[in-house]
Amino acid sequence: MHDIFKEIWTTITHNRLRTALTGFSVAWGIFILIVLLGAGNGLIHGIMGNRMKVLTNSMTIFGGETSKPHDGLGKGRSIELNDKDMDLTREGFAANVDDVGAELDKGGQTLVYADNYTTDINVSGVYPNDIDINKRDLLVGRFINPIDLNERRKSIVLSLNIAKELMPEAPLNLNGRLIKASDMAFKVVGIYDSDQSRVSNDAFIPFTTFRSIYNSGDKTGNIVFSFHGLNTEAENEAFEKAYRARINRQHRAATDDERTIWIWNRFTQDLQLNTATGLISTALWIVGLFTLLSGIVGVSNIMLITVRERTREFGIRKAIGASPWSILRLIIVESVVITTFFGYIGMVLGIAATQYMNATIGQTKVDNGLFSAQIFVDPTVSIVTCVQATVLMIVAGTIAGLIPARKAAKIRPIEALRAE
């Protein structure tokens, strides 16, 4: 075996430029594959991270407007959700709906504590289920509870960012104190963690308190609920169709009018995201494998050239008793050595590149003015995947070396000795 490697080393060093170019194509193939997979993972991790911020099996219903005349009423009529719609949701769909709530908002509010104040705050009237559906992280205190709701208490839950504005020196100590909102005194009952998004800077008060302060009547704003028993996209579509028809009928709109309400179904959105991330991963693997193919072709070509140049040598070997297997083994081992060595270099450089991406743009965020979200998180590839890609390249390189190796093994000594 030592003699084989010594002979391979002599052959490689004798054709340095050709070996270097072939090795570059192998290393480049592995490098590009790992970088592509890392970038894809960064995008997928960003999507998954944002998805985890809400309860998957939940829906939010928004009022819209009619798009067609019905029952003597014209199109373009606004649909405002109300208490009857909440009752219908709770009672008419009890087989699937768990916890029903609603949300009303009032923007541009000023909150004051002592000499500090913060402006342009969105105050939301919510039900207790809001914390579960939107997965808010409480740092201290509690969220709005049923007692707050029933007694219309002036309780308020702040984000950490708002608390820092009102009490910069010790924001968490604001819990349990009185602040002013809408010129009324509210007791801070909880402070939740801010995740840098606009939505996380809202202040929350009981839904019933909001109604009484802002005279909202029987309007509910958005209806929010969790559900169970809807496990496929088809089941969710059937539920949405039935729900829309019942709500439309209640508002004297056509049952098939899809613009009367907008349903944000986080479950179907989650299914679509899973499909999208799967397609992204598959597409990146396909592109990466085609890049690997260029390296494999390079290995095959250099082996064919090697066989052609050494035809006379192989003929002499066979004439003095060398077996076809020994020649076959020589070519295959040379192919494996080239792909292994340069494949390893490509793998190391690829890992280094993904680590650099992670250090520089691994926490990239997008901000559209309404919210900010991380879109590129941890763009790295596991060592297992890197090794698998390299092993795949080595196996492919071995197969690529088989064609010229078989050609070399079949050379007849007389024909080989006649070769130039």
Give the location of each predicted region.
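A short amphipathic helical element positioned immediately N-terminal to and/or at the very start
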Residues: 1-13, 85, 89-90
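Short cytosolic juxtamembrane segments of multi-pass membrane proteins
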Residues: 2-3, 405-420
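Transmembrane alpha-helical interface segments in multi-pass membrane proteins
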Residues: 6-9, 13, 17-25, 32-40, ...
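Hydrophobic, regular-secondary-structure patches
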Residues: 41-122, 129-132, 212, 234, ...
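Peri-transmembrane interface segments
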Residues: 47, 237, 254-288
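Short juxtamembrane loops and helix-capping segments at transmembrane helix boundaries
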Residues: 51-52, 352-387
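Mid-to-C-terminal secondary-structure elements
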Residues: 129-144, 152-253
